[in-house]
Amino acid sequence: MATVILGEFEWDDAKARANERKHGVSFVEALEAFLDPHGITAQEIEDADRFVLIGMSRRGRVLFVVSAESGERVRIVSARRATPSQRRVYEHGPKG
């Protein structure tokens, strides 16, 4: 299992290739969503070790990214285009 490290991010190379084939989103594009100042991050309820981010990439696509803390780095687990309801959360904010 080859781990790719890019700055404060890391991911499994085979997982990244499979994710891009399935969802059409590379993990390099996914890490751009972390740079979005309007991105929304939440801890997953089912898995306390994972976090979800809805943010925009430089390509202008709103992405849904699942990540986990891995020591001092953020490990990208999966990434896909946001669903319409997730996009609304991004555009209008989570309901209080």
Question: Where are the regions that the model predicts?
Answer:
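Ribonuclease/tRNase effector modules and their secretory precursors
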Residues: 1-96
